[in-house]
């Protein structure tokens, strides 16, 4: 038998295939490892920033509780409830039948406040402590801290401390944001360099991309990592036209936690549905892939709805109707294969999508009588018209709910993020228009770059959200980083017409400029040094714990009430979680203490709510000549014009505090006035 030549075609082909497969596996492993590494670096970075800002390691546990301001304290209080309960199940039972948060009402806080992060962390904390104890691990180290004029306190550090376990969980989840941005950069650029470019942009604009390092317990801290992770998986699915049960499972594994952890997730997913709709209507997503995506959203919604005990806001928000609208469009699209004129096709689908989404949204809200999300549309309405009420003022007078600040745009331009993203965006749009038949469609052909178009449209949606409400720049800035990675996409930037040397040189030059402009931002973040201390509030809480009954009911401004509940465990009537029509009505009644209503009328309101004590801060009655509508006096003149000519109750409280004469405010009585900051009125 004749021997085959050494360099036979079969052997060369086998060798080539093996080499290609090995290269592919090595490349994939490199991408995964680098992604995990940047995630770990991000975790360490946010942890360091948090410690630098608060000097958290040297605080006593009660000081750590006070450091969780406003709604952060409210969320942490439920974690504290579960870990201090006799058993995990009893703790969950306590928070699902809560009578402390809104005195006079029993509420299911899991349904109302998206508390699954606290439930999960509390569930993990108990067995972790037990296992560490059995293994003789030292997981907590305690010492006494001298606080100068204040009494010494015991401070405990280590993963065994409930606070450390909690914030470590937050920062581990938050660290994955950098990983997802790196993977997205690789996906849209077809290059590891694109991944590096996107994650460098994120690092150098970190202060404009997230606030987890300052406010760990907020819902966005837990949910956004899953939202951006979901976007990464969705981009992969669209890019490689994947479909089937495994992809549904992957997408659902990210979408469900995101929905459970943050009420705003459904609005973020609504923008995603809109972005997918546009890509699908331009024939950039195949039918099978579109079905996979919409099925994952339907399953995620149903699981989220059930685990949140039938959260009413999920039914009436735009997300649920948009899922049904896109699902219908996907399934009727084969019937429209003969409609070849693309503008007519897209317009027809857009009319169907908008009609079903808005029709169902309005119909469900009216039919079920649910107004929980009405304040969102009131806020948007107030931004473009003269409309305003007490509730919209509480939002829009806060900087984070105002329009995006010019300084933010200036910073993002200064680090070259916006210029780089704009160059990438314009280049993509130019190539897309050039290579896509926008007039006539061939339903049998699926276009390329659907994953890029999806992310570009998602960026546009995120930018609109950020410009309207500054707090939402956490969606815009990361997506600017993702789109900036297109600069490393060789197919978009010149292709074979530009030599590899020139492309690499341009990329290296851009990265060098990014380092030059971005490193000072990182240094500035790391140079933030602080130490949390609030002796006035500490004195107040000591007084409450030693001078009031355990079942004494408190009212006051929303931020303070969250900390009163967390630290003193006293029942409260109002709190900072404002996304429910009932609590908005309660808060309006409580804040009548800052109005110009007759004092007897306000006393009656407090009595009817069962309030025993009202916590008042002198700064609550301050004036602002620049924005008089943004102080409580101005808000109440707008809300209650018939009493605008009367003496403000604020003036009476201040006068009584200064003169120590309770007769001026009878039947109220000042029972605490120790530090000219906090005043407690007995009802």
UniProtKB/Swiss-Prot annotation:
One of its GO terms (biological process) is carbohydrate metabolic process. Expressed faintly in neuroblasts QL and QR, more strongly in the neighboring epidermal cells (dorsal hyp7 cells, ventral P cells and lateral V cells), and in dorsal and ventral body muscle cells. Keywords: Developmental protein, Differentiation, Endoplasmic reticulum, Glycosyltransferase, Membrane, Neurogenesis, Transferase, Transmembrane, Transmembrane helix. GO terms for molecular function: mannosyltransferase activity. It is found in: Endoplasmic reticulum membrane. Disruption phenotype: Defects in the cell polarization of neuroblasts Q cells. InterPro entries: Dpy-19/Dpy-19-like, Dpy19, Glyco_hydro/deAcase_b/a-brl. C-mannosyltransferase that mediates C-mannosylation of tryptophan residues on target proteins such as unc-5 and mig-21. Mediates the attachment of alpha-mannose in C-C linkage to the C2 of the indole ring of tryptophan. C-mannosylation takes place in the endoplasmic reticulum and frequently found in thrombospondin (TSP) type-1 repeats and in the WSXWS motif of type I cytokine receptors. This is C-mannosyltransferase dpy-19. It comes from Caenorhabditis elegans. The gene is dpy-19.
